A protein has these predicted regions:
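Boundary/entry segment of secreted carbohydrate-active catalytic domains
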Residues: 2-18, 24
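Structural preference for beta-strand elements that scaffold enzyme active sites
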Residues: 6-8, 33-37, 59-65, 133-137
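Active-site beta-loop-alpha junctions enriched in small/polar residues
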Residues: 12-14, 39-41, 65-69, 139-141
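Short, acidic/polar
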Residues: 17-25, 116-123
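A short alpha/beta connector and helix-capping loop motif
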Residues: 18-45
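Acidic (Asp/Glu)-rich catalytic clusters
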Residues: 24-30, 47-63, 82-88, 125-129, ...
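Active-site gating loops and adjacent loop-to-helix segments of metal-dependent hydrolytic enzymes
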Residues: 73-106
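Catalytic domains of cell-wall/extracellular-matrix polysaccharide-remodeling enzymes
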Residues: 110, 118-158
Length: 158
């Protein structure tokens, strides 16, 4: 049985700035993209409207681009102190998350990641078309950290 292969031309970080949103939308309108990874914790104004305008132009698959290293958290900052500073901004790099995942704080990190992950997925899912598969990846590939991947699998199962 022969299966047809499909290549995704993906733009990451939709929502990192208004200008990048505009550029990504332009690429989608010109048929250069068929997948867009959206930062759920974006503070860009009217991100839902910007995404809808892309859907109106062309069929594009959207992806939740989980972010644990940049910007503000989506969940309550008091619930995830290993991830954010007192202002709610993420405070760890990829390496920092890896170090914590191997430390005595591993169990607490697992619970805090789960809290933030659920909040980000819930927020982003509201932007996307209903009854469509939900694709998930992560900013700076943090889902490749074994603990984060494990939490992601757990959240998906739930």
């Amino acid at each position: 049985m022969k299966t047809e292969s499909y290549i995704y031309w993906c733009a990451d970080d939709f929502g990192i700035t208004a200008a990048s949103c505009d550029r990504i939308a332009e690429c989608a309108a010109n048929g250069c993209l068929n997948k867009i990874s959206v930062l759920p914790n974006s503070d860009v104004e009217d991100i839902a409207g910007r995404l809808k305008s892309i859907l109106d132009i062309q069929k594009v698959t959207f992806c939740v681009h989980l972010n644990f290293v940049e910007g503000l958290c989506v969940s309550d900052k008091n619930d995830i102190p290993l991830l954010v500073d007192c202002g709610g901004s993420f405070k760890n790099s990829f390496t920092g998350l890896l170090k914590i995942s191997l430390s005595k704080n591993r169990k607490a990190l697992r619970e805090q990641l789960k809290t933030e992950m659920k909040a980000q997925i819930s927020r982003a899912a509201a932007f996307f078309p209903e009854n469509e598969p939900l694709f998930i990846d992560s900013h700076q590939h943090t889902h490749m950290i074994p603990l984060i991947f494990s939490v992601l699998c757990e959240v998906i199962e739930e």
